[in-house]
Curated annotation (Swiss-Prot):
Top-rank taxon: Bacteria
Name the record gives this protein: Multifunctional CCA protein
Residues that bind ATP: G8, R11, R91, R137, R140
Record organism: Yersinia pestis
Keywords assigned: ATP-binding, Hydrolase, Magnesium, Metal-binding, Multifunctional enzyme, Nickel, Nucleotide-binding, Nucleotidyltransferase, RNA repair, RNA-binding, Transferase, tRNA processing
Domain remark from Swiss-Prot or TrEMBL: Comprises two domains: an N-terminal domain containing the nucleotidyltransferase activity and a C-terminal HD domain associated with both phosphodiesterase and phosphatase activities.
Binding site for Mg(2+): E21, D23
Gene that this polypeptide is encoded by: cca
């Protein structure tokens, strides 16, 4: 029996990155041998065991053979005669197919170390094409390692394109698509994930609402990049700089979906694209079973981001309606989420990337004024029921009106 460290732990250590979890492969053993040593079996479809002390995963070396559609349609063979090279051959990328022995020796039959040095993501074998999930995984790795200069090998991108055209991606479950997408949204360069999916044709299959934005023009005065799809990915890139939150990054991705519905004769203008985009966000989130908190913020951003851009021109009653709409009284964190996504939208334009976003400070100050109105004083005035709500609204609106007056006077 021989045990090797494999996969991401080896890859990340070679890149001098933190190793968060370790996976091991066991060659020349049977399930019975591992069970006798105190390992606990957890894999149903293939033999994976938890170490009795470290609880890290140890898998028997195995091969896989395509036996059906999708990423679950595989027959697994695990036995003592399966070699380490056999096991590494079934892996997705060469950089993930490097093993390290107990004495520190690297076993690298598919030249993963060379691809790491050259910053290339390359598939190990043509068996890559049998698992549609790998299209998303490679796009995610491209996003994760983009800051290190990694690119996808042309032959791997070609294979991914063939997979996108084959119809195999339709075998992916919504939960699996969202899980990979959520991981990609957490990377340093989430926009790269969607760009890779577009380049191989998978975006049109899995995210048609986003694909539809490419080729849709916006006024050059406000959008020198012109193309709404390009603007969308630029917005996502800025959002990733502003916040690590998946909710904010996803909302940035979806903020302009409504522009994909604008009739061509109205181009490059997109009046009413905000409310129109809300239905598309709902549709996308239902299809991929995206969590409700992520969906809710994306819908609010789609509807109100343009209003926030003009916040300093809004009447007190409109400001109050905005605060009520985003439910900022019960969910004050929404204010920063809305500001950050709107800022990402404003800066996600060619030549605007480093511009300040004073609307954010204005909105924060307006909220402080409105939120400073005492609910206790309204209740103490003797009002009952809905009259309390109405009086609270009136006082908040009055406070905003007085504050705006002082703001305007100060700027003269």
């Amino acid at each position: 029996m021989n045990i090797y460290l494999v996969g991401g732990a080896v890859r990340d250590s070679l890149l001098n990155l933190p190793v968060t979890e370790q996976d091991w492969v066991v060659v020349g053993a049977t399930p019975e041998q591992l069970l006798k040593l105190g390992y606990q079996q957890v894999g149903k479809d293939f033999p994976v065991f938890l170490h009795p002390v470290s609880h890290e995963e140890y898998a028997l070396a195995r091969t896989e053979r395509k036996s059906g559609q999708g990423y679950t349609g595989f027959t697994c063979y695990a036995a003592p005669d399966v070699t380490l090279e056999d096991d590494l051959l079934r892996r997705d990328l060469t950089v993930n197919a490097i093993a390290r022995s107990a004495d520190g020796e690297f076993i690298d039959p598919y030249h993963g170390k060379q691809d790491l040095e050259n910053r290339v993501l390359r598939h190990v074998s043509d068996a890559f094409g049998e698992d549609p999930l790998r299209v998303l995984r490679v796009a995610r790795f491209a996003a994760r390692f983009a800051y290190l200069g990694f690119t996808i090998a042309p032959e791997t991108m070609s294979l991914m394109s063939n997979m996108a055209q084959s119809g195999e991606l339709s075998a992916l479950t919504p939960e699996r698509v969202w899980k990979e997408t959520e991981k990609a949204l957490k990377t340093q360069s989430p926009h790269v994930y969607f760009q890779v999916l577009r380049d191989c044709g998978a975006l049109a299959v899995l995210f048609p609402e986003i694909e539809r934005l490419f080729g849709v023009p916006a006024p050059e005065k406000w959008h020198p990049e012109i193309d709404t799809g390009i603007h969308t990915l630029m917005t996502l890139a800025i959002a990733a700089q502003l916040s690590p939150e998946v909710d904010i990054r996803f909302a940035a991705l979806c903020h302009d979906l409504g522009k994909g519905l604008t009739p061509k004769e109205h181009w490059p203008h997109h009046h009413g694209h905000g409310p129109a985009g809300v239905k598309l966000v709902e549709q996308l989130c239902q299809r991929l079973r995206i969590p409700n908190p992520v969906r809710d913020l994306a819908k609010l951003v789609a509807e109100y981001h343009d209003l926030i851009h003009t916040v300093n021109k809004l009447r007190p009653e409109t400001l109050l309606k905005l605060f009520n709409a985003i439910d900022v009284w019960r969910k004050p964190e929404r204010l920063e989420q809305m500001i950050m996504t709107s800022e990402a939208d404003a800066r996600g334009r060619t030549g605007f990337e480093n511009n300040p976003y004073p609307q954010g400070d204005y909105l924060r100050a307006a909220f402080q004024i409105a939120n400073g109105v005492s609910i206790q004083e309204v209740v103490a005035s003797g009002l009952q029921g809905l009259a309390i709500r109405d009086e609270l609204q009136r006082r908040r609106q009055q406070a905003l009106a007085e504050w705006k007056q002082t703001q305007e006077t100060a700027s003269i």
